[in-house]
A protein has these predicted regions:
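Conserved catalytic core of nucleotide polymerization and phosphodiester-bond processing enzymes
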Residues: 1-201
Length: 201
């Protein structure tokens, strides 16, 4: 769990870490090939789409080759994306780790074009499951008597009068959420830091 996952994947796919990280996060959050190329600073191209009856922007040759190499080493990413899409098409929702149902917006017209949000299925599952863990951690912290201040994404902030004691309790509460409640096969690491303010100033 302490490995640099982006470097591990970069080495495995035989590409640089920066594009590996961009692709990892981009695919997890529903980015298509065009947006990935833009994020990587790679050229795109325009091709005519028979299905859409117009020219559309797609990855250029360099971007296509990079994505093809990535997927050749990690075919499960496309499979996972497709599984989430198929689930949304059939049930109209995705289930998180805790079993919550996250519904997706139906296709809608945006600037004269029909847009489907099925590609966001994996993103919903990732972010929704992350929220499950954080919520469980919040409940644990509250029950343990910690003075909760606010949360930022997967970060829980508290006010402490006994730093050493509360650091230990906070770490335990989050560890309980990660390891005991959801029993993840790959454990998540927990970092606890202390500062005079949220910005650390």
């Amino acid at each position: 769990p302490h490995a640099d996952i982006h470097q591990v994947i970069a080495d495995f796919c035989q590409i640089e870490r920066t594009p590996a990280k961009t692709i990892n996060l981009g695919l997890s959050y529903g980015m298509g090939g065009k947006k990935l190329c833009r994020a990587l600073g790679l050229p795109t191209k325009w091709v005519y789409s028979l299905r859409q009856g117009k020219e559309i922007e797609v990855p250029g040759e360099e971007g296509e080759a990079l994505l093809a190499q990535y997927h050749s080493f990690l075919p499960f990413m496309k499979q996972l994306q497709q599984y989430c899409k198929n689930t949304l098409r059939e049930f109209k929702y995705i289930k998180t780790l805790a079993g919550r149902k996250l519904f997706i917006d139906p296709p809608m017209k945006i600037e004269g074009e029909w847009v489907s949000f099925e590609r966001k299925g994996l993103s919903k599952e990732v972010q929704g499951s992350g929220a499950d863990v954080t919520i469980e951690g919040i409940v644990n912290c509250y029950n343990a008597g910690l003075m909760l201040l606010f949360t930022v994404h997967d970060e829980i902030d508290i006010i402490s009068r006994d730093v050493d004691k509360d650091k230990t309790i906070l770490a335990y509460c989050m560890d309980e959420a990660v390891c005991k409640t959801f029993k993840l096969a790959v454990p998540m690491t927990i970092d606890v830091s202390v500062g005079p303010s949220w910005a650390g100033e």
